[in-house]
Every structure is written in structure tokens, then in C-alpha cells.
Regions:
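A short glycine-rich, Lys/Arg-flanked "PGG" loop and its adjoining helix->strand segment in the class I
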Residues: 119-132
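A short SAM/SAH-binding and catalytic strip from SAM-dependent methyltransferases
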Residues: 104-117
Length: 175
């Protein structure tokens, strides 16, 4: 997670960025690292709250230890690792009304445009963004986003992994 943070650390304004949104961030390990560097910020998480019995972990093929989609475990994990309860806002994608405030930073690594097509979120992201909002996510089609955002910058390449992609930072929706 530290290496993930380092791919975008230089783009975070340590004084101005207060409100962070994580879409599909699992337990929130990345946000804990951000919190170590930027304490007392507000973190919002949009997750699904179910554990799939179809996903199997472990070499034997029999162990199912999936926990990253259990929102109670996520909240406990964040608190045990130093995030204050007042900093944590978790939303169940399937049941809750999603947050409608403006965010300074929106992060969705290997989720938005990876598991879920970007188009599913485009209107929602427009609604919760302002001119300075930074949206950071992984994609295999960075050029596609040139027609959606004024600013699109490739900030990291992930070419030596199974999930070959480019991490991009986007801001300022067009139209």
C-alpha cells in the first residue's frame, strides 16, 4: 500500500485537501497510509457489503477468507489501525444514499473502470467534484478520458503485473 500511495503523494495538497472518497478500496489500507501522512482528514468509503462464497483464497482452493466486503470489519480495521471514528464514513453501495458533498480527492484503484465501467459513476462523480477535485484511478484506456476531463495525466505505469494498467489523475470535467 505504501508504494500505491507514493504514486500520487506529490499531487495531494497536504494543507487544502480535507475530504477523501474511496470507491472500492477494500478494507481501507491505502486510506490508513494517507491518514498517517495527513491526519484528521475526512474519509468516505463506498463499498458493497457482502462476502462472495465464489471467491476462494489460498493455494488449496478451499479457504475462503474474504473480508474486504464486510463493512463492519472495515470499520473495525480502520479504528484498530488509528483512524478516529469521526473520520470514518462508510456507505453501502447497494443500500445507502451515496454522499453528495464535494470531495477534494477521489481514489479508486483497480475498481472504477476496472471492475466497474466508468460510465456507471460519471454523473455521480460530476455531482461531487469541483474544479480542484483530483480523481485517481487505474485504466487501460487513458486517452478515452481526454474527452471527459480537461486534465488527464498518467502518473504511474503498472506493466509488470497481471493487471497491466495506467494510473491516471483527472480533474475538471468537460461540459
Amino acid at each position: 500500500m505504501q508504494s500505491e500511495f507514493l504514486t500520487f503523494k506529490e499531487y495531494i495538497d497536504f494543507n487544502e485537501d480535507e475530504h477523501f472518497l474511496s470507491i472500492g478500496g477494500g478494507l481501507g489500507g491505502l486510506e490508513l497510509i494517507i491518514n498517517e501522512n495527513l491526519q484528521n482528514k475526512n474519509y468516505h468509503f463506498i463499498e458493497r457489503n457482502f462476502v462472495s462464497k465464489k471467491v476462494v483464497y489460498g493455494w488449496s482452493g478451499k479457504v475462503n477468507n474474504e473480508a474486504y466486503n464486510d463493512l463492519n470489519i472495515q470499520k473495525s480495521f480502520l479504528e484498530i489501525n488509528g483512524m478516529k471514528p469521526s473520520q470514518i464514513n462508510i456507505f453501502d453501495y447497494d443500500k445507502d444514499k451515496l454522499p453528495d458533498q464535494k470531495f477534494d480527492v477521489i481514489i479508486s484503484l483497480l475498481s472504477l473502470d476496472y471492475h466497474y465501467d466508468f460510465e456507471i459513476y460519471i454523473e455521480y462523480l460530476r455531482k461531487i467534484s469541483n474544479l480542484n477535485t483530483k480523481i485517481i484511478f487505474d485504466t487501460i484506456r487513458p486517452d478515452y478520458f481526454l474527452k471527459i476531463f480537461k486534465n488527464v495525466k498518467v502518473i504511474a505505469l503498472q506493466e509488470n503485473t497481471t493487471h497491466k494498467s495506467k494510473r491516471i489523475l483527472c480533474s475538471q470535467f468537460l461540459n
